[in-house]
Amino acid sequence: MRFPAASVAVDSTPQLRLLQMKDSHETYSTVQLVHSPLPEKGPNSVLVDVPQQISRRKPTAEQSFVSGSDSSRSSTKSSSGSRPVMTTTADPNIVTAASTESVSSSPKWLPKKADTDDRVQRSRERNRIHARKTRQRKKEQMQSLEGRATDLKHEQIRLKQIINEKNTANILVGLFSKGQSQSPNEDPRVEALMYRSVEEIPDPSKIPELPALILPGQHASKKIKVAVPVVAASPQSMSDGGGEEVASTSDVSGDEQQVPDDGIDYDLLGKDRSKCTPEELDQIRRERNRMHAKRTRDRKRIFTEEMAEMCRILEEENHLLRVHLGGLDSDFKSESTTTSTHVVDRIDSVLSTPTLASCAPPQDMVSVSLSPSQLPSKPSTKEVAFNQLQTLLDVAGSFERQQREAERKVPQMCSISAASDTSTSDSSHHHRQRRCHKGDSDRPVKRQRYQVPRSITTTTSLAAPVGW
């Protein structure tokens, strides 16, 4: 913007000159100029740049020229751009406040501020990425610890089941040994693990959580309600010692309100919100957020430490069970080899009797003509135990069959002795019945019932007629 033509009056004071400009709105503005001695030769003219505040108020006034003589008055236009530049002719000592930048160009501090904001934004984004990765890493660590603890628990249950099966097999093998088998000295820790139930095995769900924190001044009414019934229920509440009990309960409630010294301003958090200023409320909010964040970190840290300790304990217990199981395997092999000979000897002695010779189980014999490649392989421990049990069942079955045959022979002997004492008519009748029974091979042998004779009579056979 340019000044329109205006009347100019210059003061004749040598130290100070006042330029009065009258614009189109008949308003005056004064500009104070600093006077400096001018050279004797050459034109004396100064281009004055109106300050920014004056240009904002008076957008029509921008620049003026001051001449050394009263008669020379002129105005020139600047050709340096959209904004004029204040220049001095013939006097380098005059200080000017001209600006070399145009209005359309941006200030110098704008690029620096933009770079600073961009750098801060990148830093915040980088921090968010690191925080997210840290949370994800801790979450995966906790999940891995939980899975490890669960696997160790299942492994311990499986080891205990295998040990119980081995103990049962050792008991069955020890029944046929000549002497009483002495059980090996077990580790008391292993014995305690074997008698421990599945519910008592450590589990991630049994880890205690961080206790709730009661801030000072909060839930005070609940504490009083809980403390009063305790005093009323005591038998000495109505006696002289009631006052002492009330004092003790108040002391306990005061002790319960003790908070840890962890850098959190709990006194500020315990203030009454209705009596706080907005600044204090904002400070309380920030402090509360800090407290919750810190307790969350502490809770995760405690859970991780407890899980690591639980995994370590389960690994030690499983190692003890594996060592004990290895000892049982070696003992079972040695006992099976020593007792197998005794079992075979007892079975041979039982089967050597004539009544059980026919009931002896077949034995697999190795032919001499077999080549070494055709020899049977060495049976495993389970096969040996199974063969021993099968042999025992066969022996028990042979004893049962022998007893049945003995019971069948007793009625036959009784029937023969009774038939000799009866009359001839009865004996013939019995002989016919016996023949009928012998002819019927499908029916099982049954015990015959005979009547006891009441008297013994003798009969003479009738003489045959002559010529019969």
UniProtKB/Swiss-Prot annotation:
TM region positions: none
UniProt subcellular location: Nucleus
SUPFAM superfamilies cross-referenced by the UniProt entry: Leucine zipper domain
Annotated segments matching region Disordered: 55-149, 234-272, 400-468
GO BP annotations listed: cellular response to nitrogen starvation; positive regulation of gene expression
Amino acid composition bias (Basic and acidic residues), ranges on this chain: 112-128, 401-410
Region (Basic motif 1): 119-139
CDD domains with a match to the protein in the record: bZIP_AUREO-like (cd14809)
Region (Leucine-zipper 2): 313-320
Cysteine disulfide partners in this protein: none
Annotated GO MF terms: DNA binding; DNA-binding transcription factor activity, RNA polymerase II-specific; RNA polymerase II cis-regulatory region sequence-specific DNA binding
A GO cellular component entry from the record: nucleus
Annotated bZIP domain residues: 117-165, 279-333
Function comment: Transcriptional activator which binds to the C-box-like motif 5'-TGACGT-3' and A-box-like motif 5'-GTACGTA-3' of target promoters to positively regulate the expression of genes involved in the tricarboxylic acid (TCA) cycle in response to nitrogen starvation. May also regulate the TCA cycle during day-to-night transitions.
Protein name per Swiss-Prot or TrEMBL: bZIP transcription factor 14
Gene source species: Phaeodactylum tricornutum (strain CCAP 1055/1)
